[in-house]
Regions:
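Structured-RNA-binding interfaces characteristic of tRNA pseudouridine synthases
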Residues: 1-246
Length: 246
């Protein structure tokens, strides 16, 4: 048995998410079927994590096992992209790995990126690829709020009601807030995240940036661990799984 890691880029707009669902088209199933077709054996793809419907990836990581060694990886990548590119999926690379490697369990850090377009007019080019916010946001307040999130905390406040994680305790390694002209980029780094955690944190930072909340209220919202008090989560369209570190 041989194991291969694949790095994947995709636009999640037209998919139900990464994971195979009973209804709708998933990214996982789309790639699995194409691999099965080309390699002429049933392939099961294991991702580093699930992305929800509408969420994109700059470099999702996954692995699959195959009986025989792939003779020409470059040819396989080209063939995969021939079928997948029209569906807004791109295979960046395929690498041979040992059988101890696991796309999810071997990950040391995950990086998510969230894009906000902060101007009066929405972007035509980045339609459904970023969150358009008309009201001018206070970047300094957002930066101060983001620093309060760094460290090991009980993130119950930002946890989806249907989150299946055993514990709400997570360690956020770092948060970066960068503005380029009218686009704001928020980057979050952690070994693992709770379901909807990033989108919920961005939604709360938006309230802070709009001055609907002051910094003290933002801190209290985190401490209270009450989902009813939290701001609405940011839309999926602005969220990107950026990179998996092993």
């Amino acid at each position: 048995m041989h194991r291969y890691q694949t790095l994947i880029e995709y636009l999640g707009t037209s998919f139900v998410g990464w994971q195979i669902q009973k209804k709708g088209i998933s990214i996982q199933k789309t790639i699995q079927l194409t691999l099965t077709r080309l390699l002429k054996q049933k392939i099961i793809l294991y991702g580093s994590g699930r992305t929800d419907s509408g969420v994109h990836a700059l470099e999702q990581s996954a692995h699959f096992d195959i009986k025989n060694k792939i003779k020409n990886i470059e040819k396989l990548v080209k063939s995969l992209n021939f079928f997948l590119n029209p569906k807004m999926i791109s295979i960046i690379n395929i690498k041979k790995k040992n059988l101890n490697f696991h796309a999810r369990h071997s990950a040391k850090e995950r990086s998510y990126l969230y894009l906000i377009q902060n101007r009066i007019s929405p972007s035509t080019i980045n339609n459904k690829r970023e969150w358009h916010i008309r009201k001018k946001l206070d970047l300094n307040l957002i930066k101060k709020g983001s620093k309060k999130l760094i460290g090991t905390h009980d993130f119950s406040t930002f946890r989806a009601s249907n989150c299946n994680a055993n514990s709400p305790i997570r360690t956020l390694n770092d948060v970066f807030v960068i503005k380029s002209k009218t686009q704001i980029k928020l980057k979050f780094k952690s070994k693992s995240f709770l379901k909807n955690q990033v989108r919920s944190m961005v939604g709360c930072l938006k309230y802070l940036g709009e001055k609907k909340w002051n910094l003290r209220k933002f801190e209290n919202i985190i401490i209270m661990k009450d989902r009813k008090r939290v701001a609405p989560p940011a839309p999926a369209c602005g969220l990107y799984l950026e990179k998996i570190i092993y």
